[in-house]
Amino acid sequence: MKDISRRRFVLGTGATVAAATLAGCNGNGNGNGNGNGNGEPDTPEGRADQFLTDNDALMYDGDITDETGQDEVVVVTGAGNNGFAFDPAAIRVDVGTTVTWEWTGDGGAHNVVSEPESDFEFESDRVDEEGFTFEQTFDDEGVALYVCTPHRAQGMYGAVIVE
């Protein structure tokens, strides 16, 4: 009788441990660490980072250049060794800031076009002229996600966080 009780005890303990282990694995989290459960970033920084990282944006190293407090900000268009980058690739600005993209003349003809997942819509002409500029004033909070369409495959992407 004593052996049966010990067996039942071991069996019962094992079942309890297994149930507790499975319960811990059965949570509704998605494992991405952002806590919103849908796999999408829930912060402007997260949206910009995911967009730039997923698209292998040139000159993006994970840093977002803080340009808050500035009325006007310049983003170099045609930056980098091959002229296929925006510099800086990611910036943070205040509502009301005007961002000016200025062409270097390197890397061929460029444009600046918002992507469908962007909170803003804008599109420049496709130009290869050094010194050409395109301006966009951001009057609302949000995230501008953009690309140079001729150089999408080369990783020419950028982001503006407006707060």
From Swiss-Prot:
Tell me where in this chain the Plastocyanin-like domain is found. 48-163
* Region entry Disordered, spans: 26-48
Q: Which GO terms describe its molecular function?
A: copper ion binding; electron transfer activity
Which residues are involved in binding Cu cation? 110, 148, 151, 156
* GO CC term (a single one): plasma membrane
Where in the cell does this protein reside?
Answer: Cell membrane
Tell me the keywords, alphabetical order. Acetylation, Cell membrane, Copper, Electron transport, Lipoprotein, Membrane, Metal-binding, Signal, Transport
- Can the keyword Protein biosynthesis be found in this entry's annotation? no
Please state the span of the N-terminal signal peptide per the UniProt entry. Answer: 1-24
Q: Give the positions of lipid attachment, kind S-archaeol cysteine.
A: 25
UniProt-listed PROSITE patterns = COPPER_BLUE
Which Pfam family name is an example for this entry? Copper-bind
Mark the residues carrying the PTM N-acetylcysteine.
25
**For bias kind Gly residues, which ranges apply?**
26-38
Q: How does it sit in the membrane?
A: Lipid-anchor
Q: List the InterPro entries.
A: BlueCu_1, BlueCu_1_BS, Cupredoxin, Halocyanin, TAT_signal
Q: Which NCBIfam families match?
A: halo_cynanin
- Outline what the protein does: Electron donor. Binds one copper ion.
The protein depicted here goes by the name Halocyanin
Organism of derivation: Natronomonas pharaonis (Natronobacterium pharaonis)
Q: Which gene encodes it?
A: hcy
